[in-house]
Amino acid sequence: MDIAIHHPWIRRPFFPFHSPSRLFDQFFGEHLLESDLFSTSTSLSPFYLRPPSFFRAPSWIDTGLSEMRMEKDRLSVNLDVKHFSPEELKVKVLGDVIEVHGKHEERQDEHGFISREFHRKYRIPADVDPLTITSSLSSDGVLTVNGPRKQASGPERTIPITREEKPAVTAAPKK
């Protein structure tokens, strides 16, 4: 009976847990890190799993992310759109939804040719008037969509509590 001996420093291409790179961890159109090109000694282990991409470098954390915040006085949506020019972006309100769409046709960059397109939708809360929503694009490529929240009608007032002499719950009649 022959027994196959596998050395831990030799990669086995069909080992079920082998995952030298994950397709969904890639940031297409972004620069490569040295760790993307060269294997480390730990990645040679058949049990090595590449850490999620958000552990890679601080500059990757804010790439392509969006954030929706409800602040005390306004709705605020921030979206990283640094790969798009203002002419390639559209922001519109349809009913109670903010739609952001970005698209640019194929163009050449330092790695080859790339085209991008995205759609994002955000539900507008009931206390934000859709007609008051505005958007702006910063110099570093962050699209901000704002909408002021409606103020509560009237000033705050304290409601006094009165005491009644009869109970709120009475016993059910006996049969």
UniProtKB/Swiss-Prot annotation:
The modification N6-acetyllysine is found at residues 92, 166. One of its GO terms (biological process) is negative regulation of apoptotic process. Residues 56-164 form the sHSP domain. Residues 142-175 are annotated as: Disordered. Its main location: cytoplasm. The modification Phosphoserine is found at residues 19, 45, 59. InterPro entries: A-crystallin/Hsp20_dom, Alpha-crystallin/HSP_16, Alpha-crystallin/sHSP_animal, Alpha-crystallin_N, HSP20-like_chaperone. It is found in: Cytoplasm; Nucleus; Secreted; Lysosome. Belongs to the small heat shock protein (HSP20) family. PANTHER family: ALPHA-CRYSTALLIN B CHAIN (PTHR45640:SF5), HEAT SHOCK PROTEIN HSP-12.2-RELATED (PTHR45640). Heteromer composed of three CRYAA and one CRYAB subunits. Aggregates with homologous proteins, including the small heat shock protein HSPB1, to form large heteromeric complexes. Inter-subunit bridging via zinc ions enhances stability, which is crucial as there is no protein turn over in the lens. Interacts with HSPBAP1 and TTN/titin. Interacts with TMEM109; in the cellular response to DNA damage. Interacts with DES; binds rapidly during early stages of DES filament assembly and a reduced binding seen in the later stages. Interacts with ATP6V1A and with MTOR, forming a ternary complex. This is Alpha-crystallin B chain. It comes from Spalax judaei (Judean Mountains blind mole rat). The gene is CRYAB.
